[in-house]
Every structure is written in C-alpha cells, then in structure tokens.
Amino acid sequence: ELFHLKTPYLDCPQCFFYNSRALSGTLYIGIAKQEPEGAEPLMDVTENLSDEVPLGCIAVKDYSENTGLLAFLKSIGFITEVVEKRRSGYVEIPICRYDKAVLEDTPGQPGGKV
C-alpha cells in the first residue's frame, strides 16, 4: 500500500516499503517513492548493528536525516512495540517489533521487494 511519508525532514507522497537481506543475513527495509518511470529510494528504515536483534524485531534508524521516522512508523501501524534501545556510537537505536503484513501489502511489489 502506498503511503504519504511525513517526518521533520521529508514530506513525500506515493511511498512504499521495500526489503532485502544484508550480506550478514539481517533484514534490510527501505522506503522508496513511486515515480512514473520507476521507484526512487528515499531512506533506510533499518540500521545494521554488530549484534543480533531479537527474532521478529528490527533496529530502526531514527536519527540524523531520519529523525521522526520511528514516530511516523508507529502512526501507520508498522512499528507495534519498542522493546529496547541500544547504544551505537553517539546515538541510541530503537529495537522494535513490526507488522510483517505491511511489507507484503505494497502494490506492484511482490513481498514488498523492489
């Protein structure tokens, strides 16, 4: 399903989630904007950490240009719970449970993959 992404730094209609796996096997989730000629990647949702996150959870990048992303993801029902926060450098990364069905609900993107 397409959604209107709204954070302190971005106000962008016609967005959708896409996903893949990092070389480490960790789930990668990004947000892209649907354009007439294709998709334009906008931002990373997930952060790659040195240690594993609990099963069914992701590490959400909610700092720098992604500030406000966690609140937005909660508002659309994608993030269901923040289970912990982990320090990574100078920031704390929220570790969150998410609704997997949202990734599968992107028109024209089977399984939400680009």
Question: What is each model feature region?
Answer:
Residues 1, 14-15, 76, 96:
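Short non-domain terminal segments
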Residues 1-8, 84-86:
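Short acidic-hydrophobic surface loop/beta-edge motif
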Residues 23, 28, 36, 54, ...:
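Intrinsically disordered, low-complexity segments enriched in small/polar residues
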Residues 30-78:
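Acidic, aromatic-enriched beta-alpha/helix-loop junctions
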